[in-house]
A protein has these predicted regions:
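Histidine/acidic-residue-rich catalytic or RNA/ligand-binding cores of hydrolases
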Residues: 201, 253-260
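Small-aliphatic-rich amphipathic alpha-helix that forms the alpha element of a beta-alpha
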Residues: 219-246
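Acidic, glycine-rich active-site loops and adjacent beta-strand->loop/helix elements
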Residues: 61, 88-93, 120-121, 160-163, ...
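A glycine-rich helix N-cap at a beta->alpha junction
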Residues: 80-87
Length: 346
């Protein structure tokens, strides 16, 4: 929106960033994770306890489990803070939105918010979809317009955006502009292969924020080890919506980890993310979600790990006993963690 543009032009950060959790869809792609519908409902309750803005529940129609999840969520989930989102793709090549199965499934899921993924790279349109660029633009715009006509809030996940923009910026911007003009509520730029570094994320997000009159978000993966840094770079450039997963679960090496992203935005950058008083839920929720997916919590995870505020060296412990911030970058209680002293030979 115009306001976020002027904010970034003056170098100021956005006041608020929407946190969009995709643990239940993208996170579940991680090798070794297999979630039942019950698991997904329990995780959704934890995410609501944390207070994220959006919970992506799955892809209705992709499998029977996700259809069942949305049916049961409608009656069993009593969400206080979060909105449930159904995920799907744009209409198929040469198809008609009115009888498109995927779009129909999205509406049947009954959520107020939907997120659709579509190709935002000329190469993927011509090579993977084997269709023309005009049809690539139309597939996205038609789908957004159709879902908006049914009263939905619509997020557009611009697949392969960063690689596509590097290769053919004009086409990628055409797709985004078409989605915005069709009424998209947020354009989410996806680093689908996860190969981008923060400098590229920042400059490309800045370009898009300047070019479109629409909220811009980012969806990042951790293949370079820069998932969290990339998310922060996106916000610095004007993104007001971040998609990621709790504990960084996700395909290959994972999605960007919302746990340090939320903590960094709130504590280091002064950007509002969770409802007032909810930051202290970060540690218990991160650990609870780990339990629900049957993974051990990472003791070295920033902010919430068991050793994140554990002090072993004698010099550290004597200094910290006198003054906490001597060796702690934030007060651990802020994120629901605590200080620990370990016996050391030092």
């Amino acid at each position: 929106s115009g306001t976020s543009m002027s904010a970034t032009e003056s170098g100021a950060l956005p006041e608020t960033v929407e946190i969009y959790d995709t643990t239940l869809r993208d996170g579940a792609q991680l090798e070794g994770i297999s979630l039942t519908v019950d698991d997904k409902l329990r995780i959704a309750e934890q995410l609501d306890r944390l207070g994220v803005h959006y919970i992506e529940g799955g892809w209705p129609g992709a499998n029977p489990k996700d259809v069942e999840f949305f049916q049961r969520a409608a009656t069993e989930l009593d969400l206080e803070h979060s909105k449930l989102v159904a995920f799907g793709s744009t209409r198929r090549v040469g198809g008609d939105v009115e009888d498109d199965v995927t779009l129909g499934n999205l509406l049947d899921a009954g959520t107020d918010v939907v997120c659709i993924v579509g190709k935002c790279s000329a190469y993927h349109v011509t090579e993977a979809l084997r269709t023309g660029k005009d049809e690539g633009v139309a597939m996205v715009a038609d789908s957004v317009r159709f879902l908006k006509s049914h009263g939905r809030t619509v997020f557009f996940d611009a697949e392969h955006f960063f690689d596509g923009y590097a290769d053919d910026p004009e086409f990628s911007l055409r797709v985004l502009t078409g989605a915005a003009e069709a009424g998209a509520d947020c354009l989410v730029l996806c680093d689908t292969n996860g190969g981008s570094l923060p400098s590229r994320i920042e400059s490309m997000v800045r370009d898009v924020v300047a070019a479109v009159d629409c909220a811009v978000g980012v969806h990042l993966h951790n293949d370079t080890g820069c998932g969290v840094a990339n998310a922060l770079a996106g916000v610095v450039a004007g993104a007001t919506h971040v998609q990621g997963t709790i504990n960084g679960y996700g395909e290959r090496v994972g999605n960007c980890d919302l746990v340090p992203i939320i903590a960094n935005l709130t504590l280091k950058m002064g950007v509002e993310t969770l409802p007032e008083g909810h930051l202290a839920e970060l540690t218990p929720v991160a650990h609870h979600v780990a339990e629900l997916v049957n993974f051990a919590a990472d003791p070295q995870q920033p902010y919430v790990g068991a050793t994140a505020f554990a002090h072993k060296a004698g010099l550290h412990t004597s200094a910290i006993a006198r003054r906490r911030d001597a060796y702690e970058h934030v007060a651990p209680e802020l994120v629901g963690n605590g200080t620990r002293f370990l016996v050391s030979e030092m």
